[in-house]
Amino acid sequence: MNPRRKKRLGIVLAIFIGISATIGLMLYALNQNMDLFYTPTELVNGKPDGTKPEVGQRLRIGGMVVEGSVRRDPESLKVSFDLHDVGPKVTIVYEGILPDLFREGQGIVAQGVLEDATTVKAFEVLAKHDEEYMPPEIAEAMKKTHEPLQYTTEQKQGSGQ
């Protein structure tokens, strides 16, 4: 092989390796930032396709805050509450200031890490906008696997916290 061909081959290989490394790093970064959405029932029982999150996995979970389940630590901003759809309850632990629209009986979406089978340590809690709004992920998941929730007048008005 003459020197000119060797040089071209080296350049082509370097470009190929560079592009491959870039694509690999992009896919790795995308996979690390992907948070799958679950309802409390799907978190406990698994999704219909059999997937179930592992302890330590980042995820998003959406559902309704159970009435009377909000527990606040008087010495810190730590709050824990139960979340449900129409099945099992999941405990959410959050340290920070909750959104103004957060209240018992309202829908929320929490983003966090699964600590054990029924506990999520959230680093972000989002409250729904009004009593008629339901996040698209929750509405779609509930249409597929659950009966729609019927709100009482008390739930629609809020708990008055």
UniProtKB/Swiss-Prot annotation:
Membrane topology: Single-pass type II membrane protein
Span of the signal peptide: none
Domain of life, source organism: Bacteria
The keyword Ligase is annotated on this UniProt entry: no
Binding residues for heme: H129, Y133
Membrane-traversing stretches: 9-29
Localization, UniProt: Cell inner membrane
GO biological process: cytochrome complex assembly
Topological domain spans for side Cytoplasmic: 1-8
Periplasmic-side positions: 30-161
Gene Ontology CC terms: plasma membrane
Keywords: Cell inner membrane, Cell membrane, Cytochrome c-type biogenesis, Heme, Iron, Membrane, Metal-binding, Signal-anchor, Transmembrane, Transmembrane helix
Entry's family note: Belongs to the CcmE/CycJ family.
Cited NCBIfam families: PRK13165.1 (NF009638), PRK13254.1-1 (NF009727), PRK13254.1-3 (NF009729)
Function field: Heme chaperone required for the biogenesis of c-type cytochromes. Transiently binds heme delivered by CcmC and transfers the heme to apo-cytochromes in a process facilitated by CcmF and CcmH.
Name of the protein in its database record: Cytochrome c-type biogenesis protein CcmE
Organism: Vibrio campbellii (strain ATCC BAA-1116)
